[in-house]
């Protein structure tokens, strides 16, 4: 029959092996979230035209395309590098926060390299804080973005009834919905990283106690 110390050592070894597998899944989903974040930042499909809109078109954070008259041709403009071309202060703020969220999650992925040099639990906690901050920036970006719907360019596409937080004849598109889903994803990833980091810390403390007991018995 195994002694309590031997049983504890087997438990620790099994847990570390299982947590390693969970950590790999966490890393994969973090990379997936980064891709989602980049797509939301770049794609101009946050809001778009509807059946009754005066003009065809679609808007992103900083890039937008609007039709002209009865022509099906869309005129596109706006660039993050040309901040003055963004039609609304709210769109500029939303672009900044979503861009910051993207930068943080890319920084989190770069931090994976620290697993080879630093304490694993500490790296998990660093990544958890970065993911939590990334989620907070996404929340701010998604909340601020509708404040710019009263911009003249948006009204030209969506109609005069369009106002802050009211889209008039337009509708929300997939990139906006994806960004909202990304918030939940980032929060779950952050929570999981905190759990993994704290659990590894407690396991290390227990292992040190067992080793000290073994040394004392010897």
Swiss-Prot record:
Q: Which domain of life is it from?
A: Eukaryota
List the subcellular locations: Membrane
Q: What is one GO biological process annotated to this record?
A: sensory perception of sound
Can the keyword Magnesium be found in this entry's annotation? Answer: no
User: Major location, coarse class?
Assistant: membrane
- In the record, what lineage is assigned to the organism producing the protein? Eukaryota, Metazoa, Chordata, Craniata, Vertebrata
The residues that cross the membrane are: 22-42, 96-116, 126-146, 177-197
Its topology with respect to the membrane? Multi-pass membrane protein
Q: Which cysteines are joined by disulfide bonds?
A: none
Q: Which InterPro entries match?
A: LHFPL (IPR019372)
Question: What Pfam families does its record include?
Answer: L_HMGIC_fpl
Q: Which family does it belong to?
A: Belongs to the LHFP family.
What protein name applies here? LHFPL tetraspan subfamily member 3 protein
